Amino acid sequence: SDSAKVEKLFQWTVQNIQPTPDDWSVVDDHILNIIIRGHGVADQRADVFTTLATYSGVPAFWVSLPKHSDAQILLSFVFVDDRWVVADVANGFQFRNSEGELATLDELVAQPARLKMYAAERTVIKDVSYAKVFSGLTMPKPQSPLRAELQMPLKRLIYEARAMLSLGTNDESD
């Protein structure tokens, strides 16, 4: 199932792509090199996970939320069973709802106690608790085509042709 596939890809990413140590330089690179190196910063680790999911046939993307805030959470969204479920690769959180299924952002925002099971008060972003940063978040609109799809030859060709002919790309990313 897509859910099982996503769970395995998430676990593989968390186990095999470690956080880049603070005293190492950050290399902005292709995900293949990040996989070979075995480490990356938060957005690189999320990019590995969402690209692997997309290549395996499960659409996925990552984004920092809330937009235009100093305290942001980098979240990954994966389309499983006709809904966008959410994960936090950097913190190793693959969220589940009260039924034990992979959770959507709306489910987590509606159940702050469940979110606190994952992120204790010790988890902070720029001196703001994880739960507080998470509260009030809304599902972002997925980029189209997805970032990982732009690495697929045919999708990239179509994207570039649409851009060149000013037909629009539906790319609302910052």
Show where each model-derived region lies.
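Extracytoplasmic/periplasmic, Sec-exported soluble proteins
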Residues: 1-5, 34-45, 68, 97-100, ...
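Cysteine-centered nucleophilic/redox motifs
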Residues: 9, 34-64, 76
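Short, solvent-exposed loop/turn and secondary-structure capping segments
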Residues: 20-25, 46, 73, 87-90
